[in-house]
Each structure stands twice: as C-alpha cells, then as structure tokens.
Amino acid sequence: MIFMKELFLFLHVVLATFWVGGMLFLSLVVAPYLKDKPQIRNEAFQEVGKRFSLYGTFLSLFLLFVTGLVNTYLIQGGFRPSIHTKLGVFFVVVFISLLHDLWAGKKALYSEKHRVWAKWLGILNLILSLLLVYLGVRIRLGY
C-alpha cells in the first residue's frame, strides 16, 4: 500500500506541475515574447493554446481529479477540511478552463472582447491553480 501512495502522489504532483507550470510558462515566457510580434501573436496563441488545452485542460485536469480521488482514499484518517475546499476550487478551475478554452480562447482570434476575456480567465485560472497547490501542501501536512 505504501508503494501505491507514493505512486499516486507522484503522478498527482507531476500532473499539477505540468498544469501550473504550463500556465506560468505561457504567462511569463510566451506572452511577453509575443507581445511585440503582433503579426504572429494571435495565430501563435491559437496554436499553443490548442496544444496546451488538449494536454493541460482535458488530459491533466481529468487525471488530476482521478489521482486526487485515489490520494484522498489512500490518506489514513479520512477527509481533511482542506480537501473539501480543494475540491470546490478544483471544480471552479475546471469550469473556468472550459470557458477559457472552448469559448473565449477560440473567439479571441476574431474579437478583442474575447481576447480580453481569455486573458483575464487565464489569469484567474492561474491564481486559483496556485491556491490548489497551496491547499495540496496543507493536505499533505495534515490540515
């Protein structure tokens, strides 16, 4: 059982690293690079966004949910209060991710309004995802 705990916690951390790290990379590296390149900015964001959406939003978030449930089951002592908060925030992140990827992000190429929406949904998603990392730390510390 110890091996299972380690395996699922490892997978959960790797997936969270991919998800949050990807958003940090997009906002701190890709976006500033493309800011001064208006001729390719929109198309580049569309292409990068599609790829990250597939692996980040759909695959990572689904697997984070599964590994999170398994990790919750494997924690001895039952549910911690932080788990309930983390689940609530997680579902908000999923909703915002879908709104960003399937609505605002897709229309951002053709509409300034949607580009602004996509930007702010992405920022909100990053902040909430960092909150999820913090809550994960609290859970591992027994809170």
UniProtKB/Swiss-Prot annotation:
Primary localisation category: membrane
Pfam families to which the protein is assigned, alphabetical: DUF4149 (PF13664)
Compartments it resides in: Cell membrane
InterPro entries, A to Z: TMEM205-like
Transmembrane segments: 7-29, 52-74, 87-105, 120-142
Swiss-Prot/TrEMBL keywords: Cell membrane, Membrane, Transmembrane, Transmembrane helix
Keyword Membrane on entry: yes
Membrane topology: Multi-pass membrane protein
A single cellular component GO annotation: plasma membrane
Name this polypeptide is given: Uncharacterized protein aq_363
Native species: Aquifex aeolicus (strain VF5)
